[in-house]
Amino acid sequence: KYFNMTGWRLGWLVVPEALVDVIERLAQNLFICASTVSQQAALACFEADSLALYEQRRAEFKARRDYFIPALNELGLTVPVMPDGAFYAWADCSAACARLGLKDSWDFAHAALHQAHVAITPGRDFGSFETAQFVRFSTANSMDELHMAIARLKAWLKP
């Protein structure tokens, strides 16, 4: 993901010595027979200009996260774990649901879309264990869009 090449069937693993044989067999099936184009693109990832660009993007994603997560927390949409490497925020919306008379994150996501004009994903899309109280936000948007989303949520949640 760091190189923006998800789905290219390329990769490597770092594992303890005792797992090398087993993981090697698994890895062969995950990224065997990479095309020449994919291999050349992968090599280009390690050029100085490419690495500088990836570091710039990483810093931009970090800045977005560092703005957005505290802003969600201030709105009462608690993010229990600070994302480290992902561009999503997993936020607890149960207090907001109780305040707004909403049943769960499904209703919260629907209301956020139609009332605040902010698209989020209900937790149940990611499993069944305690997901009804969580929603997922993307922080991959521009900083301007994240500011707009927070402003809209704030106006909706704290009238």
What are these regions (language model features)?
Residues K1-P159:
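PLP-dependent class I/II
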